Regions:
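Terminal targeting signals and extreme-terminal segments of soluble enzymes
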Residues: 1-157
Length: 157
């Protein structure tokens, strides 16, 4: 289920600025909880900064993989928002975990690999403050506005 305010904001924003993306993130509860800040958005890609918190912990001495996956998914979505105002849902995501991190700010860089009529693909890397690779991922999104008509859904759905 989507948040009505976040849907409205996504429709309003095309080729969004970092400021507009941060305002959008404040309307999405999970994004706001992550505390990510879009620090730049340009033709090369989008950069986010995420201050580490104790709530990000998984096993002792490690950040929970779901947190890193969420940060990667958010970063990828922000890259699409910067280019075309948003995207549909994530339909595939692959994450590689390279190094554990227990504290300190995380930094992401997301770049568009392909923006198509039906799907879009974004590559994301996550680094720590020392530029060590923490995780990387690739997200595939259904293009915004491409929804099946309700009568086209299978009867069993």
């Amino acid at each position: 289920m989507t948040h009505p305010e976040s849907e409205r904001r996504a429709r309003e924003v095309r080729r969004a600025s970092a400021e507009a993306m941060n305002a959008y993130n404040a309307t999405v509860p999970f994004n706001a909880w992550l505390g990510a800040e879009v620090v730049s958005a340009d033709h090369e890609g989008v950069r986010l900064k995420v201050p580490w918190r104790v709530e990000f912990g998984g096993a002792p001495g490690m950040t929970h993989g779901g947190i890193l996956a969420g940060i990667i998914d958010l970063s990828a979505y922000m890259a699409l928002m910067a280019e075309k105002g948003g995207a549909g849902p994530t339909i595939d995501m692959r994450i590689d975990y390279h190094r554990s991190v227990v504290n300190g700010t995380l930094f992401t860089f997301a770049k568009l690999l392909r923006v198509g009529a039906t799907i879009s693909t974004v590559e994301v890397v996550v680094h720590d403050a020392e530029q060590r690779l923490i995780a990387s991922g690739r997200c595939v999104f259904l293009s915004q506005g491409r929804k099946r008509a309700p009568d086209a859904l299978p009867v069993d759905a």
